[in-house]
């Protein structure tokens, strides 16, 4: 059935259709509803996400006050680049997207069959679906991991393990070329699965998640639009140029190139990406604006809760 183009298209279409149906029953974001002046709807949505037994009155009041203050000055695309805080946030979001794409995730997924052939891996072409399964299953578990682990830690571990995997594959490729590699053809497949698993655990979802965490509500939509467009432009460019890189430096060096960029990505995270878990939107934005406030004992709106909403 899958070999039939019509049935294959129907199978692929079933997934977005399922998402469409599911989203019909999903409440709107409390932050968005509050920004539209729909107080009662925002409260109902937040109660849906928090659970009936949780007290949300303090969080609703804090959210209402913050959004009212942030929405006083709505910005245009041009004005995004006029404030220190939004410029820093754009640098962080653009940087994360750059290193996410420069890890080579899309070329590896799209050219998996050709890559395995370069490694002399004798597998059924359909076996490359294992990589897709690793991506989907790891993404599911990462949603639970994001609730307990810090963003920076996940990004650093994710980039490091991706670099280690790709670097190991590059070494393995050159060992194979010199006829000194082990005969176990499952090594490349297993290593690629590790690469994809750690991508899905951090580098994949966190740059998108942080878009809702590092920008004020009044600029989030425009900043997200710019960043998303930049992301897909990079995805197209890296995927398009991958074959040229392979032709120029062969598969082993190309994977090594991606590994080096993953290392640089981890350095970028260490020095430039702030921790956002367990912090309020105001605290994060104050950091970008260079404002230092005295810590007070107050109710904290966890950023991840808003982004999940």
Please tell me what each predicted stretch does:
Residues 1-49, 68-309:
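Alpha-helical transmembrane bundle of multi-pass membrane proteins
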Residues 56-68:
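Short, well-structured alpha-helical segments
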């Amino acid at each position: 059935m899958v070999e039939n183009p019509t049935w294959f298209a129907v199978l692929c279409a079933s997934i977005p259709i399922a998402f469409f149906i599911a989203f019909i029953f999903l409440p709107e974001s409390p932050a968005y509803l509050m920004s539209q002046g729909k107080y009662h709807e925002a409260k109902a949505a937040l109660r849906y996400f928090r659970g009936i037994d949780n007290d949300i009155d303090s969080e609703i009041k804090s959210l209402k006050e913050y959004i009212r203050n942030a929405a006083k000055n709505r910005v245009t695309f041009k004005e995004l680049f006029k404030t220190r805080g939004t410029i820093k946030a754009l640098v962080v979001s653009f940087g994360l997207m750059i290193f996410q794409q420069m890890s080579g995730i899309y070329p590896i997924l799209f050219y998996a069959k050709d890559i395995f052939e370069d490694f002399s891996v004798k597998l059924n072409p359909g076996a490359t679906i294992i990589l897709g399964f690793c991506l989907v299953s790891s993404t599911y578990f990462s949603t639970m991991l994001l609730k307990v682990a810090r963003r920076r830690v996940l990004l650093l571990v994710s980039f490091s393990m991706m670099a280690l995997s790709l670097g190991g594959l590059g070494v393995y490729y050159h060992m194979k070329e010199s006829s000194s590699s082990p005969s176990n053809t499952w090594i490349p497949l297993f290593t690629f699965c590790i690469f994809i698993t750690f991508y899905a655990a951090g580098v994949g979802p966190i740059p998108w998640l942080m878009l809702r965490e590092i920008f004020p509500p009044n600029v989030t939509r425009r900043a997200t639009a710019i960043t998303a467009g930049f992301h897909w432009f990079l995805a197209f460019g890296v995927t398009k140029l991958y074959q040229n890189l392979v032709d120029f430096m062969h598969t082993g060096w190309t994977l090594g190139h991606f590994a080096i960029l993953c290392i640089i990505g981890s350095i970028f995270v260490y020095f430039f990406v702030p921790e956002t878990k367990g912090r309020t939107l105001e605290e994060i934005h104050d950091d970008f604006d260079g404002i230092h406030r005295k810590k007070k004992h107050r109710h904290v709106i966890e950023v991840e809760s808003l982004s999940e909403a």
